[in-house]
Amino acid sequence: MTVKQTVEITNKLGMHARPAMKLFELMQGFDAEVLLRNDEGTEAEANSVIALLMLDSAKGRQIEVEATGPQEEEALAAVIALFNSGFDED
């Protein structure tokens, strides 16, 4: 099964190196695959910092987060919480 939720990027600088690394590190604790998709359809796997940086995700963009795997619910909730916290940057 797959779970999805859309979240808005709220931190001032969007997805840059520090938030990408935080998201990558967060995903290491879950048995789930997480895919992010921007409003133009560009996709990035959360376990790839380079892909996350290429997602073109500036402040205000909507990102769909999709999780699949044994811990998909927990992984999705953790990713959404990280986005909602502004990656602890603001």
From Swiss-Prot:
InterPro entries documented for this protein: HPr (IPR050399), HPr-like (IPR000032), HPr-like_sf (IPR035895), PTS_HPr_His_P_site (IPR001020), PTS_HPr_Ser_P_site (IPR002114)
Cellular-component GO terms for this entry: cytoplasm
Compartment(s) where it occurs, according to its Swiss-Prot or TrEMBL record: Cytoplasm
GO biological processes: phosphoenolpyruvate-dependent sugar phosphotransferase system
Main location: cytoplasm
Domain HPr: 2-90
A Pfam family matched in the record: PTS-HPr
Keywords, in A-Z order: Cytoplasm, Phosphotransferase system
Catalytic residues of the enzyme: H16 (pros-phosphohistidine intermediate)
Transmembrane regions listed in the UniProt entry: none
GO MF annotation: an example: transferase activity, transferring phosphorus-containing groups
Further comment: Enzyme I of the sugar PTS has been shown in PubMed:7876255 to phosphorylate NPr of the nitrogen-metabolic PTS, though much less efficiently than it does HPr. This process may link carbon and nitrogen assimilation.
Function: Component of the phosphoenolpyruvate-dependent nitrogen-metabolic phosphotransferase system (nitrogen-metabolic PTS), that seems to be involved in regulating nitrogen metabolism. The phosphoryl group from phosphoenolpyruvate (PEP) is transferred to the phosphoryl carrier protein NPr by enzyme I-Ntr. Phospho-NPr then transfers it to EIIA-Ntr. Could function in the transcriptional regulation of sigma-54 dependent operons in conjunction with the NPr (PtsO) and EIIA-Ntr (PtsN) proteins.
Entry similarity comment: Belongs to the HPr family.
Protein name: Phosphocarrier protein NPr
Species annotation: Escherichia coli (strain K12)
